[in-house]
Amino acid sequence: MGEGAGILVLEEMEAAVKRGVPILAEVCGYGLSGDAYHTTSPHPDGIGAMQSMSNALRDARLDISDIDYVNCHATSTPIGDAIEAKAVATLLEKSTKKKNRPIYISSTKGHTGHLLGAAGSVELAFTALAVQTGVLPATLNLQDIDPAVQFEGLVQHIPHNAINYSSGHVIDSTAVPVDKSSGVRFAMKNSFGFGGTNATIILRNPHI
């Protein structure tokens, strides 16, 4: 558990450009679902997670293979983490489009603790910065990856250290220069709640 808050400014693209303010990312898709499977546990087949992501992809007119990075809800529960990773991998397996590299996935709750009601906004800020800089945040303190969440060639976990998306190289320093042409085109943020309430937002890099 942790304490925190996140505030993101949502503005029309034309207004932001006119004001000359830095644009971190563009919201291009949003999806919701409610599987109501259990008070605290998601559906074992990942139905709710897949539906939420599918709805967001449909809204953005994208395929899962277009996504470069997923900031997972992942609360470090054996059941929830495995189901969410499986849902991402299943969507990729069902996709008719080929992806040359795996989707990178990580959870930033290891950095902040679970912020409950503030988790979604803070983690969306992490995701927006990943789009802007091309630096994909690691799952802090991840030592041993559970075989249940490993899907060879489909999803790539980011343990220990952040990585540069374009090069795939590990980044040890937290002081990373901004690269607007980071190579990250689209990133997805999942936020799941008790009772099977699921939300997904897709961000686009407006600079590439």
Predicted regions and their residues:
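Condensing-enzyme catalytic core mediating Claisen C-C bond formation in acyl metabolism
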Residues: M1-A60, D68-Y69, L142, I208
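Active-site-proximal gating segment of KS-fold condensing enzymes and close homologs
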Residues: G80-T96
